[in-house]
Amino acid sequence: MQTCISKQKELTFDDIINYYSKGENQNKRIGLEYERISIDSKTFKQAKFESLFEIIKEFSKINGFELIYDNETIIGAKNNEGSSISLEPGGQFELSLAPKEKLYNVHFAAQNYISQIDYIAEKYGIKFFAIGNQPKTTFNEMEILNKRRYKIMAGYLPTIGRLAPVMMRETAGVQINLDYKNSVDAKRKIKAAILISPFLTGFFANSPFRENKLTKYKSIRALAWKYTGPDRCNLFYKGIIDYTYKNIYELYANYILDVPMIFISRENNYLELNGKITFRDFMKEGYKGLYATMEDYLVHQSLCFPDVRLKNCIEIRNHDSQNLDVAVGIGAIYKGLLYNDNAIDKILDYFAPLTSSDLEDYGFLAAKFGVNFNVEKLNTKAFEIVKKLLYLAQFNLEADEQKYLDWLIDLVNSKRCIADIILDGVKNNL
């Protein structure tokens, strides 16, 4: 890889803070990023990439999407309105929707695209499973998408997290994106989302199977993320919970700057770093004649994987994949909770006794038990907490959007999570 001879404008901390400031807006939109597991319908193993490429091409031709390549490899497609489809490392198929104000419009747009994708996929013998983990194929049997950053990540991440290969190749999730008005609003939303994250992780646990058999966990996906890398996953920016601070942009950026870098990209080439320096080091000193740019920072922060991530929106990422109705229901929960100041106040007050260490512990319990574990600090059970959250969210939704939570409320009233439905079905068929 050739290094740069002339130094570009030095990237400053203020540049990074300005990036987050430019994300501010007064909207109250819901963005949905929806991954599903790609399965060969005959073998129930990982789908072949060649078939997935054909699905992308055919879908793009119908909908006027532009194909996205990494060198010669198709990695996705996008339209000019902000929606896209893409492939994850193990062939997980992701639909990313442009954010919308109304949940109905999110649901309609997603259903329209998904029905097309599924129809095309049937011709290639492919099915997409809305679950959190590959049920049969394990990472050591799987191909990885021929995308250069994935190949580099696949080499580095297992050195810092023993389940990183599981996370990369086997898992699929639901991500909800929210707007923020300013740094204070972003801080409140992010903190509230983090405080409730282990309990919603448990409620939406949907990956009890791996290697074609039941595991001891209700969310293998959540467990895998716990062992992917403590310096870049889960709640690595603990200060948001454990001490008082003024500006969330500064707090978050400082944590991102201290995360080790995986690679630097220049002119379609990659220089592997594999954790040798942090981004703060790169900003101060450069590396082999290269100097930090804003694009470098954006790539670097995208390689940090907390459950709640700040970009030019707030990304909430801690849910196993679900059927579409449930995925939209997840969006409904956050719309009802985090676009209402009174609801945020109630969350911050109720969960105030919890520390970052508590949240980490409850995250492990959620992965194993779903919603059936004690929350001793709050003197209650996890399913009781989820029940409170769902009723609060439904109360704050518009009348025509409350229906998205009806079934979920029935489920939590039965003291069960999504995975329990699968497990009950297995027991009934024994």
PLM feature spans:
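Glycine-rich, histidine-containing beta strand-loop boundary motifs that form or position
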Residues: 97, 130-134, 180, 204
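Long, hydrophobic, well-ordered secondary-structure blocks that form the structural core
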Residues: 129-148, 194-200, 212-215
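Carboxylate/His-rich catalytic cores and anion/metal-binding grooves
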Residues: 121-131
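Acidic, His- and aromatic-enriched active-site or binding-groove loops in soluble protein domains
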Residues: 146-167
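Residues forming anionic-ligand binding surfaces in small-molecule and nucleic-acid pockets
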Residues: 85-101, 166-175
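Membrane helical hairpin/interfacial module
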Residues: 90, 97-98, 103-106, 110-115, ...
